[in-house]
Amino acid sequence: MKLKKITLILIIILAVLVLIAGAATFTSNNSIIETPKGNASVVVTGDVMFARNMAGVLSLDESPFRHVENVTGSADLLLINFENAATTSGCAVKGDVPLKCDPSYVPLAKANNNTVAALANNHLFDYGTDGMKDTLKSLDDAGITHIGAGNNESQARQTASSDINGRNITIINYMDSNNFKEYSTDVMPQANGSNPGYSAYDSDVAKCQIQDAKANGSDVVIVYFHFGNEYSHSPNPDQEKMAHEVIDYGADAV
């Protein structure tokens, strides 16, 4: 009887040890192990414009990026400023230097499978709101993500987000409304409420968007501005102020 009690006690102890070991294994197997994040490459261009004398080149159906495609095509993400309307409209609303291209050329701007086109610039609305809508449709049809302009403020303020090798990259696009003041808001409209337009820089909006992106797990936030004086090689005080503001709000690159 005594032997049975000892045997029973040993069985209970062994069972407890097995449970403890199992619990330890369970805890170990279910602990959060952070997956290492890989590198992510982003190529950023300046103005990409298919207007003026570009039609003769584009009609050859060759990539305008062919001499740099080893750079633009090999990156994980390509960010461009698409600086013209893509429309067949002949009704320019801007009297000087209106820029447009035929919508059929838009796919040539996709020099990378992951291409983002920034539209907050001073030529998107050269052919009015209809020209802007034609441009958005052409970019959608070409599979190019677009930011910085839209049919309303919510659409214009949308950001682009990509998950690359375990890293989340968010891109935000603004234009400085202090530039090009010679044009009325009818010619160069700022998106406001339900009204179409470009995404104008607003300090409070930028702070909210950047901090929201970070709070939602974005590893890298890029703010892509269209600002500064044309043909100038140095930043003006407004540019410096805005750049420092968004960096203070948490932007990683400007």
Protein language model regions, located:
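Short, low-complexity patches enriched in S/T/P/G
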Residues: M1-I9
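Acidic, metal/ion-coordinating pockets
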Residues: L8-V254
